[in-house]
C-alpha cells in the first residue's frame, strides 16, 4: 500500500485486493473493499496508516456491499455473494459475520438498506424476486415482490419510507411495500439495460436512470409517459447518482477501448456540458460514494474505487458546489420572500405516507441565506424538477405534430402564437406566460385576428382553456400541450355540430360527419359491411382447464385507461367512431418507446383513402423526441413490437373437489371389492377428506359378501332394493335438479351432495367399484355377449345416437346424418310391463326386448334389481368415468385412467338376423311397402340424394344407412366410409 497526496485528492493503492465493490459508512469514517479472499476495512481519516482484513471463504465474488445508513447501526454492513447475503458487524477494530440471508435461487444483483428503518434490507435477483428482509428475523423475507423479468437494480425512496424502485432490463417499476402484489407504476425508461438508478435526495417523485443506450434520463413517476430531461452521451453510462448538495449529478461511463475513465460532475438543470471532470483513474471506475460532511466544513469528499486497484478521495469545495446550483443561488432572496406563496405539493398515490415538514423559524431562514446549498433550496429545486425547468425547455419538448395546428414560440418574450385550421374556420390565439409559470400561475389566452369563430364559441373555448391550464399549474405542471389538444378537440366538436345542423335542419343529428375538405376524417364507410358487427378487441379473458389450472390474460401493462372507469368500452367497430372526434380516448400508452403501440385516440394518421377496420385500430406511435442516438436510429425500425398482454397460468387445484394425490392413491381391485373400499378410505384420510372416509366406509359395508343376492328371485328381495341399498348410494349422487349439470337426472335420488360439489372423482370411483361388484361372474361388462335369442330379439336402429362398431366405446354417430332406419325383428313385437316398474338399459338404448318365455324375462329383471347401480342411469355413470379419465390423462396418470375406463360400458354389436322388418324413420311404426300407413311418409330415404327410395336399394347391415343402388355404387367406388358421416366402414361390414 502506498499513499500520494495532492491538493485535489488522496490516492491509496491496494495492489493485491482484487476488490469488486466498495462502500463508505454513514459516519464517513470507514470504507470497505470487497475482495474474493478478504474484506478490507480502510480508515478514511488516516488511509495511509494501514487497513484491517476480514477473511472470507467463498469461490464467488462479492456483487454488492453497503453499510447501514443509520448512525445507531453504522457498524453493520451487508455483502452479497452469489445467492446469499452476509451481514457483517465491524466494531472495535474487528469484524465478523453476524448472520446470512438465504432465499434467492439465482445470483443477487443488488441490495439496499432502508433509509428510514434501520432493520430493513432489500435484495434483488435474476430469479425475478425482490425480497425485503428484517435483520431481527432472518429466517425468511418479510415481503416478497415478484416481477416477470429479473431485477438488476433496487433502491429505496429517500423521502417515502414505503416506496422503492427496481429496474428490469430497460423498464422501471415503482413498488409500495404495503401492496406487494403489483407495482404502483411502470415506466418504459430505456431501450437497453439499465445500469444505474438513484432517487433524488429531496423529492420523493424524481429519480434518474443510466443505461446501455448512451443516455441518462430524469423521471417523475407521476408522469410515466415522458421523461423530464435527458442527458445524451456518446458511450453507455455505468452509474449516475445525485450529489448530496445542490442539484448536481455524477456520472461514470462504460469506457470504450479503455480510453475514458473519468467521473463527470453535472448541473442537472443545465446538461449542456459537465461542470467538472475528475481525472486520475487508469482503469474502469467500479464504485463511487460520498463521505459525510465534517462539522464546520463546507467541503465534500467523493470516494472512488477503480479496477486499477486505487482508492481516491476527491475534494469538492464550495466553489465547485456553486456550479451545480447556479440559477437557484442567484435567486435565494427571491425564494425566501416567496416561500409562503408556493403551492402545495401534489398528492402522491398514498397521501398518508407524506411526512409534513415543519415551518421555518427566523434563525433557520438566516442559516439559509448564509449557506445557500441547503435542503430547502434543494427542495424548491426538486419541486421544479417535476416538469421542464424553463419555458424554453417546455417549448423544445412539446409535440408540434398536432394536426392542423401551427405554433410559433418565443421564449424570450414568454409567449407563443397558436394557429388552428378546422373546416372553413380559422383560429389564431396569443398565449402569454407569466414569470412564475408554472408555479400556480396560469398563462393568459387572447384571440387575435384573423379568427372566424363566433363570440359564443370564443367564450366557451376560453373557459375550457382556463380550466385546463389551472388544473395543471395547481400541480406545478406545464399546460401548453394539453391546452393545444383541448383547443383542437373542442373546436372540431363545435364545427361538426355546426355542419350537421346547417346541412339539413330537418334531419336527425348524426354523430359521424362526412369527410372535411381540409384534412383526413374518419367516416362510417368501414372496411366491409360485416365490419359493423365485429366486436371490440378483447382486453382480458379466462378459461379453466381440467388439470386444475386457470389460464387468463389481461391487457398489456403498457396501457391504461385515459378516461374514467365508468366510461363504457366500445363493443363494435361502429361504436369506435365516437372516439374519432378527439373528445375521448379509450386507452393510452404508458411509454413513449417507439416499439410500443397505443390504442387509437382520435388522432388519425392515415389518409382519406384508407378505411377504418379492426386491423387498423392499432398503429405505431410517432416519436416525440426530435433527436435520437445512432443506436436508436438503426435498431428501432427493426425492433419487434411487443404490445400483447401477459398470459398467466394460475394453479387453482386447491379450490377444486378433485385431488391429484387421491388419483395416485386410489385403487380398483375387481377381485376384492372390500379391500378396494378399505384402502380408498385410508387414502382419503391421508389427504384430509373425512367425508370421503365415511363414504368409503359405507361402501365397504354395502359390498359385504353376506349381502350378496340370491340367484333365485323367489327366495328374497335383493339388497339393492332395500332402502340402504340402491337408494342410499343414489343419495350420494344428488337430486333430480342438482344432477342436471352433471348429466341426465338420476331417478330416485333424494339428496344433493357430490353432484352439487362436482366431485367427479368420487362419483367415477364409486361407479367403478359398484360396477365391478355387481357384474355377473365371467361377464366383462353388463353389456356382454347377448344370449342366443336370434328368433325373438328385436334390435331397432333409429336416427337417434347410437354406438358404432369402430372399436371405441366413446365414438357415437351424429343423429343429424341418419336418414333411414331398419331392424332385425321377430314375428311378434309385444311389450310386457315390469313388476318392479324398471326399464332395462337395452330398452332405453338399443330398442325393446321381447321375450317368448315369461321366466326368462323374470330372470333378466332379477339381474337388474340386484345391482346397486340403476341400469337406467348407465349412460350417466359412463359420463362420470370418461370425465374422470380425461382428468387422469391430464395429470399424466395413464395407467389409472386405463383402470377406470375398463368399467365404461361398451354396447355389443347389434344382432344380425336373416329376416328384415322395416320401421318408418319418422313415426317408428312397422311398415309394409315404401310408404308408411300412419304418417304417410316414405319409408326409405337415400343418404346421397335425400329422395325417397322406390326401386332398387342397398343398405348397410351394420349402420342401417343406404339408398339407391346406383348412388351407393358410385359413392363407394372412391370412398370407404358411410356417406352419412356416422363413421361406419360399410364395405368391410357388408357387401353391395
From Swiss-Prot:
This is GATOR2 complex protein WDR59. Zn(2+) 2 binds at residues 945, 964, 967. The keyword Membrane applies. It comes from Mus musculus. Residues 343-373, 849-870 are annotated as: Disordered. As a component of the GATOR2 complex, functions as an activator of the amino acid-sensing branch of the mTORC1 signaling pathway. The GATOR2 complex indirectly activates mTORC1 through the inhibition of the GATOR1 subcomplex. GATOR2 probably acts as an E3 ubiquitin-protein ligase toward GATOR1. In the presence of abundant amino acids, the GATOR2 complex mediates ubiquitination of the NPRL2 core component of the GATOR1 complex, leading to GATOR1 inactivation. In the absence of amino acids, GATOR2 is inhibited, activating the GATOR1 complex. GO terms for cellular component: cytosol; GATOR2 complex; lysosomal membrane. GO terms for biological process: cellular response to amino acid starvation; cellular response to nutrient levels; positive regulation of TORC1 signaling; protein localization to plasma membrane. WD repeats lie at residues 57-98, 103-143, 146-185, 189-229, 232-276, 278-318, 319-362, 660-706. Zn(2+) 3 binds at residues 956, 984, 986. The GATOR2 complex is negatively regulated by the upstream amino acid sensors CASTOR1 and SESN2, which sequester the GATOR2 complex in absence of amino acids. In the presence of abundant amino acids, GATOR2 is released from CASTOR1 and SESN2 and activated. Zn(2+) 4 binds at residues 961, 978, 982. Residues 344-373, 853-869 have a biased composition (Basic and acidic residues). GO terms for molecular function: zinc ion binding. A zinc finger (RING-type) spans 940-989. Component of the GATOR2 subcomplex, composed of MIOS, SEC13, SEH1L, WDR24 and WDR59. The GATOR2 complex interacts with CASTOR1 and CASTOR2; the interaction is negatively regulated by arginine. The GATOR2 complex interacts with SESN1, SESN2 and SESN3; the interaction is negatively regulated by amino acids. Interacts with DDB1-CUL4A/B E3 ligase complexes. Its main location: membrane. The modification Phosphoserine is found at residues 564, 839-840, 848. Belongs to the WD repeat WDR59 family. Zn(2+) 1 binds at residues 920, 923, 932, 935. It is found in: Lysosome membrane.
